[in-house]
Structures are given as structure tokens and as C-alpha cells.
């Protein structure tokens, strides 16, 4: 009898490099490739185990001395907006989010570059070309989608042709137990809208509507100001040695 080899993922470890979140720390990552007809199933399992996806790679921190990166997921069904979040939601009621296949566009890239140049000029993604951006969006074997946020036009209820300018984008994986926000960006010239917060709130509502219990936000890094926003969306769960544990803030 001939046995077909199982499509088990192989894991690799990166060399140490400077941590982008905590000064003076070194980071290492364990990663595997998400390829083949089991990629979607493997991505679900790994995300539930604290991994994140970038293109066709799933990774998680494997640092030698630091454990500051904590996987976070929102309990969508129990979530209630704070007063400030309700204000953000109301302030963006003129927006419409449309779901598309994970395909890049020149309009998306222009917004992406505007976002990076204004907010992450010295970050690791600052030199990404249009080809790099295209690979980030479409180089995947998993169930993912693009959500484009635009101002509603007078005919938006009939057709997307009536929508206004593109002001925010989210790349989102659709999993068996939730939505995973892989990457999002927005116009840096509309700070009063709090678009980052709005997109998370919108994903919570989308998860609820689809009957999905979780919205995965990636890593909260204690001590990193840029990651502090993630723990405002409660109740949520944090992944630790004993599995997912409830966190109320």
C-alpha cells in the first residue's frame, strides 16, 4: 500500500534582530509557509495558536528572554462600545465598507504610501514598492479579502460607482471562528475620524453579523505605546501558557 505524505507544516527560526517595539530588545520569530490545499485550515489553527499571517507565511514571536508580545482577540458577541467609541462610530456613519477579492489597485497603493510616509516613515515597510504592496495583498493561499472604506455617495445604495474617495483599507482573513485583521491603513489627513478605531468597530459588527465569535487583532506589546490601543476593545482574550484567558481591562 502506498501512503501519501501528510502536508504537515515545517517550522523555521529567524536569527535575532532588533525589536521594532521595545528598545534594547532582540526579537526572533518561528515561521512556516502557508501553501497547498490545507493552507486555509493550517492558517486557522495557527492563528488560534498565536500566529500572524504575512503573505504566505505564518509567524509568531520566539524571543529568548522577552514575552511581551501577547496575542489578542476580541469577544465580538459580548463587546459593547464605550462612549468615545460610539462617538467614533457616529462620526463615520457617512462611510461605506465594501468587501472585495484580495486584489491590489493603484488607488490603494497611493493611500498606503500616504499612510506610511505620514505615520511610519522609518518603519520596516517604509520602502515598499507597488510590487511589494501587490504581493502583500494577493500572495496568499488562504481565505482573505479587502474591505475598502469610502464616503457614501447619493447612489451608493444602488451601485459602488457612486461611492466617494478611498479613505481606509483593511486586509482581513476570514476564519472558521472569526475575522483576523492582517493589515489596515487609512488617510493620515483625517485624524478627527479615528479611522483605525472605526475599522476595528466595523470588523466587530461584521463578525457579529456572520455569527463569528472573535476578531483577532494580532499582538499587544506591553510597554509599547503604539500597541496600547488594542486593549481598549473589551471584553477580549489574551493567549498565555494556559490558553486563551479572559481580559476585561
From Swiss-Prot:
UniProt KW keywords: Acyltransferase, Cytoplasm, Transferase
Domain of life: Bacteria
GO molecular function terms attached to this record: arginyl-tRNA--protein transferase activity; leucyl-tRNA--protein transferase activity
GO cellular component, one term: cytoplasm
Keyword Acetylation recorded: no
EC numbers for this chain: 2.3.2.29
Compartments where located: Cytoplasm
InterPro entries in UniProt: Acyl_CoA_acyltransferase (IPR016181), Asp_Glu_LeuTrfase (IPR017138), N-end_Aminoacyl_Trfase (IPR030700), N-end_Aminoacyl_Trfase_C (IPR007472), N-end_Aminoacyl_Trfase_N (IPR007471)
GO BP annotation list: ubiquitin-dependent protein catabolic process via the N-end rule pathway
Enzyme class at the top of the EC tree: transferase
Keyword Transferase in annotation: yes
Reactions that this protein is recorded to catalyse: N-terminal L-glutamyl-[protein] + L-leucyl-tRNA(Leu) = N-terminal L-leucyl-L-glutamyl-[protein] + tRNA(Leu) + H(+); N-terminal L-aspartyl-[protein] + L-leucyl-tRNA(Leu) = N-terminal L-leucyl-L-aspartyl-[protein] + tRNA(Leu) + H(+)
Chain's role: Functions in the N-end rule pathway of protein degradation where it conjugates Leu from its aminoacyl-tRNA to the N-termini of proteins containing an N-terminal aspartate or glutamate.
HAMAP family named among the record's database cross-references: Bpt
Protein family per UniProt: Belongs to the R-transferase family. Bpt subfamily.
NCBIfam families linked to this entry: PRK01305.1-1, PRK01305.1-4, PRK01305.2-3
Protein name: Aspartate/glutamate leucyltransferase
Species per Swiss-Prot/TrEMBL record: Brucella canis (strain ATCC 23365 / NCTC 10854 / RM-666)
Source species taxonomy: Bacteria, Pseudomonadati, Pseudomonadota, Alphaproteobacteria, Hyphomicrobiales
Amino acid at each position: 500500500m502506498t501512503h501519501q505524505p501528510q502536508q504537515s507544516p515545517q517550522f523555521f527560526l529567524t536569527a535575532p534582530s532588533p525589536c521594532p517595539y521595545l528598545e534594547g530588545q532582540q526579537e526572533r520569530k518561528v515561521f512556516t509557509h502557508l501553501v497547498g490545499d490545507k493552507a486555509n485550515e493550517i492558517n486557522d489553527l495557527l492563528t488560534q495558536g498565536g500566529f500572524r499571517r504575512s503573505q504566505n507565511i505564518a509567524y509568531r514571536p520566539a524571543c529568548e528572554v522577552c514575552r511581551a508580545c501577547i496575542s489578542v482577540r476580541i469577544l465580538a458577541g459580548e463587546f459593547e462600545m464605550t462612549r468615545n467609541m460610539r462617538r467614533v462610530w457616529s462620526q463615520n456613519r457617512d462611510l461605506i465598507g465594501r468587501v472585495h477579492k484580495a486584489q491590489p489597485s493603484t488607488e490603494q497603493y497611493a493611500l498606503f504610501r500616504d499612510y506610511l510616509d505620514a505615520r511610519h516613515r522609518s518603519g520596516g515597510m517604509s520602502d515598499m514598492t507597488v510590487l511589494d504592496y501587490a504581493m502583500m495583498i494577493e500572495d496568499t493561499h488562504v481565505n482573505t479579502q479587502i474591505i475598502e472604506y469610502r464616503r457614501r455617495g447619493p447612489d451608493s445604495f444602488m451601485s459602488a460607482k457612486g461611492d466617494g474617495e478611498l479613505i481606509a483599507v483593511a486586509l482581513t482573513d476570514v476564519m472558521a471562528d472569526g475575522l483576523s485583521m492582517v493589515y489596515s491603513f487609512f488617510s493620515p489627513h483625517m485624524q478627527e475620524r479615528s479611522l483605525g478605531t472605526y475599522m476595528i468597530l466595523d470588523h466587530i459588527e461584521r463578525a457579529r453579523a456572520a455569527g463569528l465569535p472573535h476578531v483577532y487583532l494580532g499582538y499587544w506589546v506591553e510597554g509599547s505605546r503604539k500597541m496600547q490601543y488594542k486593549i481598549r476593545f473589551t471584553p477580549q482574550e489574551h493567549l498565555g501558557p494556559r490558553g486563551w484567558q479572559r481580559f476585561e481591562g
